[in-house]
Design a protein with these regions (language model features):
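A short Gly-Trp-Pro
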Residues: 1-117
Length: 117
């Protein structure tokens, strides 16, 4: 499942208008090299803490984890070598999207998302 998050925290963390994420089972994630660090983002619109994991060497965001989905990691798709298959299947926090961002017809958009940031 691939989605786009438009919450202000993801915008800041991505340094962009949104963050494109792919949900994967935690058991399927393998870190090939390096060490990650984590920032626990508790200043979210839902009040839930989002763990934002990033490369300890270069600072690139790798994935986010949320308490309501403990078995799923939300991988930042921009970290993948081939991003061609990551077309958005949904949008979350569309109420926070930048005014110039247009959402695709037929792709579900949730104004807010309980549990996710």
């Amino acid at each position: 499942m691939t989605g786009v998050c438009h919450c202000k925290n993801c915008q800041r963390q991505a340094g962009s208008a949104f963050s494109t994420l792919a949900g994967v089972a935690k058991t399927d994630f393998v870190l090939n090299s390096g060490q990650m660090k984590v920032y626990r983002d508790s200043e979210t619109d839902t009040g839930n803490t989002v763990e934002r994991h990033f490369c300890g060497e270069c600072g690139s965001p790798i994935y986010s984890a949320v308490p309501d989905s403990p078995d799923v990691l939300f991988i930042k798709t921009g970290t993948m070598d081939d991003t061609s298959s990551f077309t958005p299947q949904f949008h979350v926090w569309s109420s926070s999207k930048q005014d110039w961002v247009e959402l695709e017809d037929g792709v579900p958009a949730m104004q807010k998302t309980e549990g996710l940031g």
